From Swiss-Prot:
The gene is rpmG2. GO terms for biological process: translation. GO terms for molecular function: structural constituent of ribosome. This is Large ribosomal subunit protein bL33B. Belongs to the bacterial ribosomal protein bL33 family. The keyword Plastid does not apply.
Length: 50
């Protein structure tokens, strides 16, 4: 199955907050979304963990 799990990490504090899935065949680039970080107590950019 092409859909694989990945972890999203906060760019500010480097805390791993979210686990999600994506289809790596259709979207080979790293995912970047704005999500809430409980440690920073604000919305920050979260990038796909390496």
């Amino acid at each position: 199955m092409p859909r694989e799990g990945l972890t999203l990490r906060c760019e500010t504090c480097k805390m791993e907050n979210y686990i999600t899935k994506k289809n790596k065949k259709l979207h080979p680039d790293k995912m970047e979304v704005t999500k809430y970080c409980p440690k920073c107590n604000q919305h920050t950019n979260h990038k796909e963990k390496k």
